[in-house]
Design a protein with these regions (language model features):
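Acidic/polar low-complexity segments with low predicted structural confidence
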Residues: 1-113
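Metal-dependent catalytic core segments for phosphate chemistry
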Residues: 68, 106, 128-185
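Von Willebrand factor
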Residues: 157-159, 169-205, 242, 248
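Conserved alpha-helical "signature site"
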Residues: 218-221
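Von Willebrand factor type A / integrin I
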Residues: 226-286
């Protein structure tokens, strides 16, 4: 009887342990599956519609994406830098070995790391997209040689200093305080940029402009866009609005588009990743 009782207790104990183990595994799986589903949902969610409760999760996602791109292009840079075999110098170096190439000499291929100028509309309708673009770019510091950032609504200021000394998340409130919450004036902002910072652009610079191109019926100053276009390696305009809205109401997008190498609808973090990948690709052709 005593043995039977102990066996029964042992059976119950094992059963309870197994039940708890299964419950723990199920909870873990459900939590991981839930997290993965949430991430997949956020990748496709309009940046302006991200729930504030998901902000930290979004920052993690953006940093992870940027790290993956940085790793990919840092490797490609190493691989490409070696260039091709310098036959003449290799033969000359190995004369003492009857021309048998014990020591190979490679032609060095110079690869310029990207120079990027980011010009972001931080007025109400577009501020969320600007935040994530800046977070993405500033997480790519190991593959970008120089990054200068500007923000505007009614006028434009350089924000590189703020973002050098603060994380993007901490810097954004200060930037908005200085230049946000005003009626957008693209013409005035382009004038501020060309008067004070045109020297930040040369033939190796990609200019990334983020904005909806809605200028409250003020002069769009497309003449200044032409100047920027002619100086840069490329001008890429990211617009959170769908293309069907470009050129409607006070949108000057179709006029600006004429002075962009690329103009694309960009409203999700997945769009951002694809476009930034395309930019990096132009510098690191394998």
């Amino acid at each position: 009887g005593d043995l039977a009782q102990r066996l029964e207790q042992g059976r119950r104990y094992l059963f309870e342990e197994a039940r708890q183990y299964i419950n723990r595994q199920f909870e873990l799986y459900a939590r991981n599956a839930g997290e993965q589903l949430r991430e997949e949902f956020l990748l496709e969610t309009r940046l302006g519609a991200i729930d504030p409760r998901d902000a930290k999760r979004m920052h993690r996602i953006v940093r992870r994406m940027a790290k993956q791109l940085a790793t990919k292009y840092a490797k490609r840079r190493k691989h490409t830098k070696r260039g091709v075999l310098d036959v003449r110098r290799t033969l000359r170096k190995n004369m003492a070995h009857d021309g048998i190439p014990f020591e190979t000499i490679w032609k060095q291929t110079k690869i310029d790391r990207p120079k990027i100028v980011a010009i972001c509309d931080v007025s109400g309708s577009v501020a969320a997209s600007a935040r994530f673009l800046l977070l993405f770019l500033y997480s790519l510091n190991e593959v970008i040689a120089t990054l200068r950032a500007f923000a505007f609504s009614g006028n434009l200021i350089e924000i590189s200093d703020i973002l050098e000394h603060k994380e993007v998340e901490q810097g954004i409130p200060e930037i908005l305080e200085k230049v946000g919450f005003r009626p957008t004036d693209y013409g005035r902002s382009l004038a501020d940029f060309t008067e004070n910072s045109l020297d930040s652009i040369d033939r190796r610079t990609t200019v990334v402009i983020l904005g909806d191109g809605r200028s409250n019926n003020t002069d769009p100053r497309t003449d200044l866009m032409r100047i920027i276009h002619d100086r840069a390696k490329s001008v890429i305009w990211l617009n959170p609005e769908p293309e069907t809205f470009w050129g409607t109401g006070d949108s000057e997008m179709l006029r600006y588009k004429a002075f962009c190498h690329v103009a694309q609808h960009c409203s999700t973090v997945k769009d951002l990743e694809r476009i930034i990948n395309d930019v990096l690709k132009t510098y690191f052709r394998a």
